Regions:
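Extracellular acidic loop/turn motifs
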Residues: 16, 232-234
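Beta-propeller blade termini and top-face loops
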Residues: 1-213, 220-223
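Short edge beta-strand/loop segments characteristic of extracellular beta-sandwich folds
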Residues: 224-230
Length: 234
C-alpha cells in the first residue's frame, strides 16, 4: 500500500467567517474548526476509504460549501475523484462525471464571479464545469498535457492562472465568456447562438518602443469579441 504519515496536505481558511478552517491530510481525513483551531471536528465521509486529500477549497459564494480533490495514486489507483459538501462537511457528494480515465484530480476551485462555475486541475490537464460539478469537460485548448498543480482566478484581470508541473505558468485570458455561458446560455442547447459581452479594451497613445525581447506571449491587441454558433454555416 501507499505510505502515509498523517501529514496535512491541504489547509483552507474561510473568507466568509473568522476562525473557520478546513484541513485535509494524506491519510484521507478532513477536519473542520469553527473557533480558530481551539476544537476540531472530523467531517471525513466513510465512503472515501484510503485516500489522500490533495486540496480543499471553500466556495467564494457560500460559507457552507467546500470542494475536495482526493486521490489514490499511491495505491496505483488513478481514478479521478472530486467531492463537494454544502453543509460544512455533514454530507459529501461526488462530482467526478466527465473526467478522463486516470486524470486524478489535484484541485477544484469555484469561479469567484459566477456560482456553480468550477475549474479543476488534474494529472493530465484542466477541466471546467458549468453546473456545479454535475458534468466536467476539457478546457485544455493549447495547454500542454501536463499535471495542473494549482489554479486561481486573478481578481483584477479576471484571468485563469495555472501552475503546471514542469511546463511553467499558463494564463487563460478573460474568463467572461465562460462566466456568461454559465449564466446565460441554455444548458445543453446545441442550437444556441450567443454573442458575449467583451471586456474593456484600451487604445494607447504612441510612445517610444521597447528595444528588448521578451519570453512571454501577450494577448492580441484591441477588443476581443467572443461568440458561439450553435450550427456551423456551410
Amino acid at each position: 500500500g501507499g505510505e502515509i504519515y498523517g501529514t496535512i496536505y491541504a489547509l483552507s481558511e474561510s473568507a466568509h467567517e473568522q476562525g473557520v478552517i478546513w484541513t485535509g491530510s494524506d491519510d484521507g481525513l478532513v477536519h473542520l474548526t469553527r473557533d480558530g483551531g481551539a476544537t476540531w471536528q472530523d467531517v471525513t465521509p466513510d465512503a472515501w476509504g484510503e485516500v489522500m486529500v490533495n486540496e480543499i477549497a471553500v466556495s467564494p459564494h457560500d460559507p457552507a460549501v467546500a470542494y475536495a480533490a482526493i486521490n489514490r495514486y499511491k495505491f496505483n489507483d488513478f481514478t479521478p475523484m472530486a467531492y463537494v459538501t454544502r453543509d460544512y462537511g455533514e454530507n459529501w457528494e461526488e462530482i467526478s462525471d466527465g473526467f478522463a480515465d486516470e486524470a486524478w484530480v489535484h484541485v477544484v476551485r469555484e469561479d469567484p464571479r459566477t456560482p456553480g462555475l468550477l475549474y479543476a486541475g488534474t494529472e493530465t490537464g484542466i477541466y471546467v464545469s458549468f453546473n456545479g460539478g454535475d458534468l466536467w469537460q476539457s478546457l485544455q485548448l493549447n495547454l500542454p498535457n501536463t499535471p495542473i498543480n494549482d489554479l486561481i482566478v486573478h481578481d483584477r484581470e479576471n484571468d485563469l492562472v495555472v501552475a503546471t508541473s514542469g511546463r511553467s505558468f499558463w494564463i487563460l485570458d478573460d474568463l467572461s465568456p465562460l462566466q456568461q455561458a454559465a449564466r446565460d446560455v441554455p444548458d445543453g442547447d446545441e442550437n444556441s447562438h450567443h454573442l458575449y459581452s467583451p471586456r474593456h479594451a484600451y487604445r494607447l497613445a504612441g510612445g517610444s518602443g521597447f528595444g528588448g525581447g521578451g519570453e512571454g506571449v501577450n494577448g492580441p491587441s484591441g477588443a476581443v469579441i467572443d461568440f458561439m454558433l450553435g450550427e456551423v454555416a456551410d
